[in-house]
UniProtKB/Swiss-Prot annotation:
The gene is rplS. The keyword Repressor does not apply. This is Large ribosomal subunit protein bL19. The lineage of its organism: Bacteria, Bacillati, Mycoplasmatota, Mycoplasmoidales, Metamycoplasmataceae. One of its GO terms (biological process) is translation. One of its GO terms (molecular function) is structural constituent of ribosome. Keywords: Ribonucleoprotein, Ribosomal protein. Belongs to the bacterial ribosomal protein bL19 family. It comes from the Bacteria. Pfam families: Ribosomal_L19 (PF01245). This protein is located at the 30S-50S ribosomal subunit interface and may play a role in the structure and function of the aminoacyl-tRNA binding site. HAMAP family: Ribosomal_bL19. GO terms for cellular component: cytosolic large ribosomal subunit.
Amino acid sequence: MQAKLIEILESSQIRLYPQFQPGDNVRVYFKIQEGNKTRIQIFEGLVIKFKKNGLSSNFVVRKISHNVGVERTFLLHSPLVEKVEVIRSNKVRRAKLYYMKKRSGKSARLKEIKRKELKNL
C-alpha cells in the first residue's frame, strides 16, 4: 500500500527531458536565487556521470572555465532545473567518464556521433 502511494506521488513530480547519456555535451538551464531575485543560469559541459534512480536521478556535468575544471551535480527532476538541451552526442564506451578529468587539449576530444531523434526519458 505504501509503495503504491509513494509511486503515485513520485509520478506527479517526474519531468520529461531529452534523452542523454555520459559523453554528451549538454546545456543545463537552472534557477539561481540571489537575494530576492531569481534568474536562470546556463551551465554547459560534458556529462561524465548519469545515475538513474527514479525521482532522485542525478548527473554530473564538467566544463573547463579559465583553465580550471568545474563540475556540478544536478538532480534530474529538480524544480530548479529549467531545461536540459543536448548539444552534441559523443561515442564513449564507459558509463562513468572520470578519466576525462586527467585529460586536456587534444587528448580530451571525443568522437561525435549523429543521433536521428531525441526520445524523452
